[in-house]
Amino acid sequence: MQFPDVKLRKRDEIKKFSKIVLFGAGSYLDEVLESFKKYNIVAIFDNKTERGSVELKKNIKIMNPKDGIDQYMDSQTAVVMSVCSYQYEIAVDLVKNYHIKEEQIFSMCADYQEERMYNSELIFEHLEELRQVREMLADEDSKEYLDNVIRFKLTHNPLYLKPNSRIVGKYIYKMSDNAFIRPREEDYIIDGGAFVGDSVEFFMKHTNGRCNIFCFEPFAGNFEKLKELVITKKLGKKVKIYNAALGNKSQSVSISANQSVSARANVNEEREKKNIILQQRLDDLSTEIERIDFVKLDIEGAERFALQGAENMLRKYKPQMMVSAYHKCDDLWEIPFVLNKIDPNRKIYLGHQPHAGFEPEFYIG
């Protein structure tokens, strides 16, 4: 890829349109509605809404797109995604089956995403670093996906979010026909960003209950639900939980209590509402954790610091890893640089969660 090979398109270009249709009525809808409250939102399309059925959200109709395309879509209407998953598939459907022009379609870009995920100036400043990351990636599918993620971030165009075909399941990357990055039976798993236990249930299910999990969740409310899950499911012998964030120092830190639908945890001293929580350096727990086989890090932009705080254990055990890289724009180059510094011999791939090309993740094999 010759960086850049696309025409820059910022969120402000939505203002060129006199009307907006949002697409998606799931958990992100409220956030997108708030971000676009000053715009003329005329309808909300959702594929899960039954044909002929109409619901209301803040006096805006929610309907199946087949019922609303003719009524609400014209050349002066933009479609803005209000859903995280399936943005690529939705955009392809809009172009192919509803004949909506590509320039009318915008990816999800609520204020939170716009602030942290899209930053064209930062990307242009770090094109050389992105070229270096591209060279680090271990297969052509990862490189192609990186190219498209950069195009997407510069254009707000979900048609660039074509999935990496090597993602064959949640936390599963296909390196070759016989080699996968994935959690396995008997693995010792680090679950960074355990939330309320959804990932715990996933790991237990996909290892037939034969794994040991060390969970880290800083928010008290989430931690209590996680604790309740472990007790209710009688997982105490297999799951150890820490009411702590992961970082590069073991200390108390100020963490934002301003959580969205995804329970964001922004270690950011500039947020208005704070909680003091424990931050744990993983290397300081080496006497408590027998070994590490698989690491999942999804900790709202603190992934690079958690890696720095675990470098001794990562060098020693060489675990497979899934490291989220979508919370901050510079995750795309900062995280692989940290990984490469810890162990330059590890293979690095770039993928995403199934049907969520919007959220890049590094896989380490």
Language-model region placement:
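Phosphate/nucleotide-binding beta-alpha loop and adjacent structural elements of enzyme active sites
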Residues: 1-41, 47-365
